[in-house]
Structures are given as C-alpha cells and as structure tokens.
Amino acid sequence: MSNAASPATSAAPVRHYPMSCRTLATQEQIWSATAKCAKQIAEDYKQYNLSDENPLYLLCVLKGSFMFTADLARFLCDEGVPVRIEFICASSYGTDVKTSGEVRLLLDVRDPVENRHLLIVEDIVDSAITLEYLKRFLQAKQPASLKTVVLLDKPSGRKVTLSVDYPVITIPHAFVIGYGMDFAEAYRELRDVCVLKKEYYEKPASKL
C-alpha cells in the first residue's frame, strides 16, 4: 500500500501549543486516515483467515507509537480483525534531533511470534534505520508474515532503502512532536502532530 494521505485540511478543532510553529495533522485527521488504513489492512489480511487462535500481532514500537497503536487496534476491531498487542523498543535516537545511526534493542517481544502474522507499528519513519533493523530482527524469528504500518512517513529522510507497507500520512522534512512523539521525553501528550519550534530543540533539554 503506497497511497498515503498528505496532511489533511478538513475542518477540525483548532488547538494551539506554545512550542509548536504549526500543526501537520490534527487528532481528528489522524483518526480519519487511520480508519481508512485499517480498512485496507482488514481487506489485505482476509487471505490469512485471522481468528482468535490466529490473530494479527501488532508490534508497538515504544515509546512513540503507543497512541497510534491504541487507535489502530480499535479501528481494526471495528473491521472485525482480531489482534494481540506486543511491545518492542529499539532506537537510533538519544535526546537529540538527529539519528545516531546505531540501533539499540531496548525491549524484545515477550510472546513467541514464530508462525504468527506480525505488523510492526511505528509512529514515524525518517532515515528508516531503526525500522530496517527491526524487520531483520523479527524476520529471524520466522513469522508467518511480516509487514509495517507507519503513521508518519518522511521518504525524503531515507538513509536506507525501505518501503513501508502501510504509510498512513506522508509529511515533509520537519521535527514533529505530539500524539505520542516527543522531544527529550516532552510533548507526547499533545493531541495533534505538530512541528516543534526551532528554538525549543536548540535549547538544553533541562530547560524544556
């Protein structure tokens, strides 16, 4: 699936955040795009005869994708897709705005996933270094299938060749926060996806 939406322009409640210079996607626009993506996933996975005994495993990549995973799970439920949720954590970022290029696995899935249908759920893909690492790591566990769904795709930032199976929204190059995504662990609680003002990530994290 490559027909990701661009940031929507439909009417939605206007929320203002002092650390944001603009909003890329409101909570309501995210929900609309995620619901559409869930319908496509449900259609594509019919071939696997999913059931409570053969569910779709959503692998929530912590920390940033926790809100997206929760909403996606509910929209998949609306489409009749049985899911299980597992958590995994790997990062090529520290508290800076640039990737280090070195991926560290911080948390592995707890359940055995051999012969299971796995869907990696990411908040954002920029360089794709972390997602490429996770795909290789999880493929070694011999799942029945392995695909990726990403809320925000930034193709212009790629440092490795990688295509996302289900990109929900395509965004331009920008440092974004909100809807689970952070800068130095701040701003995850914002309802919308916003662009962080430059002066915020140029100041020490202790001053946030």
Swiss-Prot record:
Cofactor-binding details, from the entry: Binds 2 magnesium ions per subunit. The magnesium ions are essentially bound to the substrate and have few direct interactions with the protein.
EC numbers: 2.4.2.8
This protein's GO CC annotations: cytosol
Keywords: Cytoplasm, Glycosyltransferase, Magnesium, Metal-binding, Nucleotide-binding, Purine salvage, Transferase
Compartments where located: Cytoplasm
First-tier enzyme category under EC: transferase
InterPro entries associated with the record: HGPRT, Hxn_phspho_trans, PRibTrfase_dom, PRTase-like
One of the record's GO molecular function terms: hypoxanthine phosphoribosyltransferase activity
Pathway: Purine metabolism; IMP biosynthesis via salvage pathway; IMP from hypoxanthine: step 1/1
Active-site residues, Swiss-Prot/TrEMBL: D126 (proton acceptor)
Reaction(s) catalysed by this chain's protein: IMP + diphosphate = hypoxanthine + 5-phospho-alpha-D-ribose 1-diphosphate; GMP + diphosphate = guanine + 5-phospho-alpha-D-ribose 1-diphosphate
Residues that bind GMP: K63, E122, D123, I124, V125, D126, S127, A128, I129, T130, K154, D182
Pfam families documented for this protein: Pribosyltran (PF00156)
Cofactor needs: Mg(2+)
GO biological process, any: hypoxanthine metabolic process
Binding of Mg(2+), residues: D182
Annotated family: Belongs to the purine/pyrimidine phosphoribosyltransferase family.
Function comment: Converts guanine to guanosine monophosphate, and hypoxanthine to inosine monophosphate. Transfers the 5-phosphoribosyl group from 5-phosphoribosylpyrophosphate onto the purine. Plays a central role in the generation of purine nucleotides through the purine salvage pathway.
Protein name: Hypoxanthine-guanine phosphoribosyltransferase
